Amino acid sequence: NQLTGSSQHVGNFPGVTVDRKDGSIRGKSNTLVTDLPGIYSMSPYSSEEIVTRNFVLNEHPRGIINIVDATNIERNLYLTMQLMELDIPMVLALNMMDEVRENGGSIIINRMEEMLGIPVVPISAAKNEGIDELVAHALHVAKYQEKPEKIDFCDADDDGGAVHRCLHAIMHLIEDHAQEAGIPVRFAAANAAEGDQLILEKLKLDQNEKEMLEHIVKQMESERDWTVRLPLRTCDLILLKKSAMRQSLSPKRARSISEVQR
């Protein structure tokens, strides 16, 4: 609503927006903003997730504004990592910064930007704070197609490198299929490992490739002693929480938005 000047219904929880809604950014009639349902993952298990995922995968937007609740960043990390795998220019908007301030918290923005390799903009949609900066960053990354850095969160040295080897083996196995299906290979590999049937159908693997995929996944499961049907990106989440991004969340420090560090 702040971007387009519309009065659509908004809320704090996923599912409020049932379908996509389009509008132009105020003062910039040559732009198009598509409001998609709020979700916490790109898994196709709810109508909201299906609407959002189909749009992002099939309509190839020039940029994404990923709006995250700044009071509960960790809950949105999984979706953020999935979006980064799509190789689409993205800006991370930390909304509800007014509540962060009121609760005596601070977020070190430059550490998040360094960790994720994308612009991070603190905003308060309710108080119209940071919206102009958000629009400027979004238009810039869309115009110049500045895509997220390719970050391998699960590096070869983490926990024996089982997830790293699994993902890269699957990427090598499915690369040609993913390109033909128009799906970014890292996103396709992680979702295939997690048993995403819609992605597997689009990849059109032959029987031998399906058996190789299953073998790779079982090998990783045996090395890590867990089931990959839990989100494979759990590894990424653990690393992020141990990283500078986790360290950037420091309660009871900032007293005003001017103290939110860049």
What are these regions (language model features)?
Residues 99-155:
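Canonical P-loop GTPase G-domain recognition
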Residues 6, 15, 38-39, 70-74, ...:
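Conserved nucleotide-binding/hydrolysis micro-motifs of P-loop NTPases
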Residues 3-4, 56, 68, 138, ...:
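Hydrophobic aliphatic residues
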Residues 28, 51-121:
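Conserved C-terminal guanine-recognition region of P-loop GTPase G domains, centered on the G4
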Residues 117, 144, 150-262:
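Extended helical scaffolds that flank P-loop GTPase cores
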